[in-house]
Amino acid sequence: MQHKVRLTVIDKKVYPELQAAYCADPNAGPCPCYHVGDTFLFARYGAADDFWHGGLHTLCQTAQTADGTAGGDVPHCSEAWDAISRYIYAGLQGGSLMRGWMREENTMIACCSDGTRPVLFRIERLDYKAVYPAALGAPDAPDAPDAPAQ
């Protein structure tokens, strides 16, 4: 089995009263790096390795342009990456993202740590391809040598 991970921006929050009280720019507004509905796809097999490049060029869908959008022509925001990368890595390896906490163990909801304008993400492990080790003689593998007679 091989795995990909789909990341979707499901919500953005902004707390103007906190920005006014604490931020150098009291009118910072919502996060400019992500847009609700942005979708990213991560793969890590063969020559593909989206994880180690901070998710650069993983953006698949956006209501905006890829220019300046995280995962497009720029890597993911470091605050967001710190919150989501552990789940992306676990998913790419086929691991449970949050067994016993979420309804489905292949899904996690996480958010970045920006306290005045957090972005919320749905992270999903996608199980997509069975890998048959024909070279090892797996009897059910396509084009595998016949299993030894019993």
Locations of regions flagged by a protein language model:
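Short, structured beta-strand/loop micro-motifs enriched in basic residues and often containing a Trp
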Residues: 3-4, 10-25
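Short, structured patches in soluble enzyme cores that scaffold and shape functional sites
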Residues: 7-11, 44, 125
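Function-determining sites in protein domains
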Residues: 1-3, 35
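Disulfide-bonded cysteines in secreted/extracellular proteins and peptides
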Residues: 23, 31-33, 60, 77, ...
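Compositionally biased, intrinsically disordered low-complexity segments enriched
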Residues: 136-148
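Short, flexible N-terminal segments of the mature chain
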Residues: 21-48
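Short, Lys/Arg- and Gly-enriched loop/turn segments at beta-strand edges
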Residues: 47-79
